[in-house]
Design a protein with these regions (language model features):
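Short, intrinsically disordered terminal segments enriched in charged and Pro/Gly residues
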Residues: 1-9, 40, 75-132, 173-182
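Cysteine-rich micro-motifs
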Residues: 40-45, 57-70, 153-165
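Short, extreme N-terminal segment that most often corresponds to the first beta-strand
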Residues: 1-25
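Short recognition patches in nucleic-acid-associated and regulatory proteins
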Residues: 17-57, 75-78, 143-150
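Short cysteine-rich clusters marking metal-coordination/redox-active sites
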Residues: 18-21, 64-67, 139-143, 159-162
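Flanking scaffold residues of small Cys/His-coordinated metal-binding clusters
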Residues: 9-13, 58-62, 133-137, 153-154
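Conserved binding-pocket/active-site segment within a compact domain
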Residues: 124-141, 147-151
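Eukaryotic Cys/His-coordinated zinc-binding finger proteins
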Residues: 143-152, 156-179
Length: 182
């Protein structure tokens, strides 16, 4: 049985990338990730029942942590994640096609002269490796969730789930201290 999920880091966060500013951040996996992956897979499967896939109206929009851009969940995949989902979908489609053709060979008593030969597909691709990059963990008090942001980012942030604005450094004020000679 094949399994498809977005790779997580050691703390359980999933990398996201903004389609507008191209910056990456991490969030906890969402209950909508499965629907988003199903919607993407359905687009690549030529024999999928598209009416059974999640629609854009059923999936919430998410926001970029940095620039506030709003988009559907499937827009937040990194290029590696997107390529992996496409590769996995095409591999699954080849396996389904093979099983449909191999059925004829298994039932040769009904048709002793098949006009084709089914060729076994390549094995399904391995899962993506876990994400190893460490980012700074910050609380989003609006939703009670945590996100991971770039260490260099100290400007205001936007909650990826609800779009609430948070001050730089997660609401803490920056204090500039200077030494004064006496």
């Amino acid at each position: 049985m094949a399994w498809l999920e977005l790779p997580r880091d050691k703390a359980g966060f999933v990398r996201r990338e903004c389609p507008r500013c191209q910056r990456s951040f991490k969030t906890r996996p969402s209950r909508h990730d499965a629907g988003m992956l199903q919607r993407l897979l359905a687009g690549y499967f030529p024999f999928e029942n598209l009416h059974e896939a999640y629609t854009a109206e059923e999936l919430p929009s998410w926001h970029c942590l940095y620039c506030g851009h709003r988009a559907l969940p499937d827009a937040w995949l990194t290029p590696d994640q997107s390529a992996h989902v496409e590769h996995m979908a095409r591999a699954w489609a080849n396996h389904v096609r093979y099983e449909q053709l191999a059925y004829v060979q298994r039932t040769l008593s009904h048709n002793p002269r098949p006009t084709f030969v089914s060729v076994a597909p390549e094995p399904l691709p391995r899962p993506l490796p876990p994400d190893e990059e460490e980012l700074r963990t910050l609380p989003m008090v609006c939703c009670g969730e945590e996100v991971q942001a770039s260490w260099e980012w100290d400007l205001p942030m936007v909650c990826p789930r609800c779009g609430a604005h948070h001050g730089g450094l997660s609401g803490r004020q920056q204090v500039h201290l200077e030494f004064v000679r006496e």
